[in-house]
């Protein structure tokens, strides 16, 4: 079997390598060609360009690099047509891959897109383009699959790799011991984001909320895992003149450990909310942005919720506080509800564990099964979510 793969960034390389392993278990003689990173190369990928080609050109100075990006896509199209793979799989990088998939599918080649763009949230009209571009969409989340099914796009919900990676049962006390924190005092994990703008917009409010909460929860411990050295430096600047410096434990990375150790989590919306859910920890999701960005987002985003736990559950499980609503007091009150109501907290942890089990499906194997069925039988498995 010949398989053409195009990944555009580090996360795609990780997903691609897992998919290649699963496909090789089914087809030991499988050949792989396209664009991949070091993990995919280690699995036998023949990559025509470095992994960074698409991530740099696709996300940084897009207009400046557009001619080069178009040149790369034309080259890949010619190369794929000459090599004649059984299937072409675009891994994430939708702005680049969907165009290539559409061009190749028009020639009769089977195409698959692995990792849905957030078309369900904004610019929903893109689903028509996706329908013309792919023979199958492989999604991480069940509500994504439901969206594509409503629009008659062949889809398989394969589960989430992060859910596969995290255990269904975790050890709060072991995590606290590893972090050197008290095993009995209440603990709040604070994750203000991985981007500089998030620290700028959320950092001061999150620290104010921690102080507000500690005044009402004696002995409260607060741990902040910095997402990168740059974010740590920004947090250190904020803490230098902030009263929270007296009790905040600032760490390098260790976000998963911090969330597992915590009784509650305060975080920006994004993947961290999913990870907190998969650690089975109650959370408050808060987000602030530039006024113009918020004005635009309100008009473009079509979903009732912004956080993945609520979207996955299709109900409000965790508070979402956005822009003016994300005040120090509002955040503090929401956190106090979690910390002060053990029954509610434990019920939410149990619900998160159940959602975790729903997402823990062996994503790479499920994706390989769907691709194999498409190539061999010309269709997805009859019950891909069973």
Swiss-Prot record:
It comes from the Bacteria. It catalyses: a lipid X + a UDP-2-N,3-O-bis[(3R)-3-hydroxyacyl]-alpha-D-glucosamine = a lipid A disaccharide + UDP + H(+). One of its GO terms (molecular function) is lipid-A-disaccharide synthase activity. It is an enzyme of class 2 (transferase). Belongs to the LpxB family. InterPro entries: Glyco_trans_19. This is Lipid-A-disaccharide synthase. One of its GO terms (cellular component) is membrane. One of its GO terms (biological process) is lipid A biosynthetic process. Disulfide bonds: none annotated. NCBIfam families: lpxB (TIGR00215). Its EC number is 2.4.1.182. Keywords: Glycosyltransferase, Lipid A biosynthesis, Lipid biosynthesis, Lipid metabolism, Transferase. Condensation of UDP-2,3-diacylglucosamine and 2,3-diacylglucosamine-1-phosphate to form lipid A disaccharide, a precursor of lipid A, a phosphorylated glycolipid that anchors the lipopolysaccharide to the outer membrane of the cell. Pathway: Bacterial outer membrane biogenesis; LPS lipid A biosynthesis.
């Amino acid at each position: 079997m010949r398989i053409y793969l195009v990944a555009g960034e580090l996360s795609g390389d990780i997903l691609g390598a897992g998919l290649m392993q699963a496909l090789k278990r089914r087809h030991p003689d499988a050949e792989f060609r396209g664009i991949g990173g070091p993990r995919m190369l280690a699995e036998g990928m023949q990559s025509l360009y470095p992994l960074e080609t698409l991530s740099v050109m696709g996300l940084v100075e897009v207009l400046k690099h557009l001619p080069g990006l178009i040149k790369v896509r034309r080259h890949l199209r010619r190369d794929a047509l000459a090599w004649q793979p059984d299937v072409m799989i675009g891994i994430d990088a939708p702005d680049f891959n969907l165009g290539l998939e559409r061009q190749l599918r028009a020639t009769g080649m089977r195409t698959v897109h692995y990792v849905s763009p957030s078309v369900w949230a904004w610019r929903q009209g893109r689903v028509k383009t996706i329908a013309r571009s792919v023979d199958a969409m492989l999604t991480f989340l069940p509500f994504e699959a439901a969206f594509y099914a409503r629009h008659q796009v062949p889809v398989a919900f394969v589960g989430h790799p992060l859910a596969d990676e995290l255990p269904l049962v975790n050890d709060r006390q072991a995590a606290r011991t590893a972090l050197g924190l008290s095993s009995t005092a209440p603990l709040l994990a604070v994750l203000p984001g991985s981007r500089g703008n998030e620290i700028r917009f959320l950092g001061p409010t999150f620290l104010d909320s921690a102080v507000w909460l500690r005044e009402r929860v004696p002995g409260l411990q607060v741990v902040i895992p910095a997402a990168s050295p740059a974010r740590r430096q920004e947090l250190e600047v904020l803490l230098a003149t902030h009263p929270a410096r007296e009790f905040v434990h600032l760490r390098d990375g260790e976000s998963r450990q911090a969330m597992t150790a915590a009784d509650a989590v305060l975080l920006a919306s994004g993947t961290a909310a999913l990870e907190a859910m998969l650690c089975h920890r109650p959370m408050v999701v808060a987000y602030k942005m530039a006024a113009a960005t918020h004005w635009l987002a309100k008009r473009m985003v079509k979903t009732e919720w912004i956080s993945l736990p609520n979207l996955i559950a299709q109900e409000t499980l965790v508070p979402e506080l956005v822009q003016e609503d994300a005040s120090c007091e509002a955040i503090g009150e929401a956190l106090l509800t979690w910390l002060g109501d053990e029954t509610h907290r434990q019920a939410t942890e149990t619900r998160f564990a159940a959602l975790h089990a729903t997402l823990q499906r062996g994503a790479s194997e499920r994706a390989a099964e769907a691709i194999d069925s498409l190539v061999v039988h010309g269709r997805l498995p009859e019950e891909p979510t069973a």
